[in-house]
């Protein structure tokens, strides 16, 4: 099958690799422009762009696909997409808004021939439409997550559903581990669906149960110690690897990368124990932090971290 693929991060690269391995003809790839990365802030291509170039696939990296914002650039990309003569557009975490002309650029598959663009979305729609479905599911304490293959339309993840796959969210899942598990599941689901392209059908999303996964902000990283321990521990897991969770001790920002809720009571932010881990009181209960990080330093197990930065029982952190 001739496919145009649009995606940017590792989540999308997993699907692109699986499509290549399955023998599909990837005629063109869309990905976001190179971004500064690392300490040297060197321009770095996205995982999807690197994979495409490694496989000799042409890549387009427009700043926008909007004719209003960049009429010449967008029109040129629209023309290239239509001239690719693809059967299907596959989208996975691309990151740019796709206008209708892009959604209609492929010939289409499915029983009615009307599935021209299909999206790999990391949630069980209609729950967690939007930019950060994986992290928001963990943060909310959802028992399960999954991947939905969706026929794309202009609305924000509102398109009808082709198929889905589910997975439990474990007590140790982080945003990173769940994301990559869903990436594998979504890639498998897509490849299997494309084995019988003429049989694919879709159903509208349920009208009830709609929630939105807002984009993660750096400002959300700051821990509010008045919240329950269970909520804070979920945020630690959900916000790994981005934006992380942080508190301050003597004006030093400290990130927590692993923590579990435990019994304990005290003033919110009060240090309760420093033996083997850092236990801090919350609005209800306490969290025991087992992996922490200081600015400019690697993540460290709590015993080593507590040797490098001293905490006193009963002191209050912010």
Predicted regions and their residues:
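One-carbon transfer enzymes
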Residues: 1-241, 294-296, 315-318
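An anion-binding loop in the catalytic cleft
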Residues: 220, 226-318
């Amino acid at each position: 099958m001739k496919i145009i693929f649009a995606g940017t991060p590792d989540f999308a690269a997993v699907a692109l690799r699986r499509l290549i391995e399955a023998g599909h003809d990837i005629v063109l790839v869309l990905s976001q422009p190179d971004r500064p990365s690392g300490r040297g802030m060197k321009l770095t291509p996205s995982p999807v762009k690197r994979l495409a170039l490694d496989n000799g696939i042409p890549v387009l990296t427009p700043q926008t696909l909007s004719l209003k914002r960049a009429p010449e650039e967008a029109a040129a990309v629209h023309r290239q997409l239509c001239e690719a003569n693809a059967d299907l557009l596959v989208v996975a975490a691309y990151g740019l808004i796709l206008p209708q002309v892009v959604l209609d650029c492929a010939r289409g598959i499915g029983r009615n021939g009307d599935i021209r663009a299909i999206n790999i979305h990391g949630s069980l729609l209609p729950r967690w439409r939007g930019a950060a479905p994986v992290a928001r599911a963990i943060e909310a304490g959802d028992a399960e997550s999954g991947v939905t293959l969706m026929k794309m339309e202009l609305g924000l993840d509102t398109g009808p559903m082709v198929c889905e796959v589910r997975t439990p969210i474990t007590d140790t899942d982080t945003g990173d581990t769940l994301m990559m598990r869903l990436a594998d599941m979504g890639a498998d689901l897509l490849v299997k669906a494309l084995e019988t392209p003429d049989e694919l059908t879709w159903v509208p999303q349920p009208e009830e149960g709609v929630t939105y996964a807002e984009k993660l902000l750096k400002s959300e990283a700051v821990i509010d110690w008045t919240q329950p321990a269970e909520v804070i521990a979920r945020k630690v897991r959900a916000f790994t690897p981005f934006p992380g969770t942080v508190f301050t001790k003597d004006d030093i920002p400290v990130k927590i990368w692993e923590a579990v809720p435990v019994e304990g009571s005290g003033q919110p932010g009060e240090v309760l124990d420093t033996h083997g881990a850092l236990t801090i009181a919350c609005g209800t209960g306490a969290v025991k932090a087992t992996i922490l990080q200081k600015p400019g330093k690697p993540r460290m197990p709590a015993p080593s971290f507590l040797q490098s930065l001293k905490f006193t029982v009963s002191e209050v952190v912010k």
